Amino acid sequence: MLNRRTFLKNAAVTAAAAPFISTEEILNPVPRHIGLQLWSIREDMKKDPKATIEAVAKMGYREVEPFGFNEGKLFGLGYDEFSKLLKDNGLTMPSTHSMMTSKNYDAGKNDIDDDTKKVIDNGAKYGIKYLIVPYMADEDRQKMDTMVKLYSAAGKYAKKAGVRLAYHNHEFEYATKAPDGRRIIEWLLQETDPAELAMQMDIYWVAFANHNPLDWFRLYPGRWELCHAKDVAKTEKRESVEVGDGSVDFKGIFKKSAQAGIKHYVVELENYVTTPLEGVKRARTNLLKMF
């Protein structure tokens, strides 16, 4: 039974969010963090970030995941202005993508460079919980010793700042092997400290590489604190489509969310049957049916 304090606290939270929450969600709340990777609607964001963010909020999203956080601005807006835009629409950005390469590692000091420290510090300032490396550059894939040291050093610095470093996969981490014969994903999971590097599993790319996400949940439980949710089309090209419109068993995958450690479910869309905004709206609606 709820005590009075808890009831009043919950009521206050609901009231504050009321302009952005549908009646259905109030009656049937989904206690999960469901967000949108803004790469999915990047052209709309470039044209009119204000109107686009308003549209995203009206769809029912509560979290967004920007990209290019290391570039100093987000969609032409300073961090203060972008943060206010989100707040005005009942949105938060608990995670963001921010590129990091071997050039950001100082081997002599076994540390990250000042630019990377500044990015992490900005993340902490603006409430980022997860700073996510979105990609490993081609030239860095044969330097796994260096990349592990980079992520470890960045993870240590981020932890002190109150931010969690994470890595986002594509297909190649599951297909490409490092010089010692291990897959790149195995290097990252086996050679880094879980306290210093979390993982954001892109379910589409894992399935595209003909791997089963459940196998990786079982082998490395608790490492997958975020996921990108997009489906594999039932076509010869196997392009990405909205969650629920392809061949991936998301219901089966999400039943093991606790084992995986998933805290944030992030919708992403890279191919469009209709428009980007219509696509991410459909993807969210479909995603809610997978729990």
Report the location of each language-model feature.
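Histidine-acidic metal/acid-base catalytic patches
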Residues: L2-G35, I41-A57, I184-M201, W205-F291
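Acidic (Asp/Glu)-rich catalytic clusters
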Residues: I53-K58, F75-P94, D115-G127, S152-K160, ...
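Conserved acetyl-CoA-binding loop of GNAT-fold acetyltransferases
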Residues: Y61
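Acidic-and-aromatic substrate-binding clefts and catalytic sites of carbohydrate-active enzymes
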Residues: I41-K47, F67-G78, T101-D113, M136-D145, ...
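Short linear sequence motifs
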Residues: R32, E54, G72-F75, M144, ...
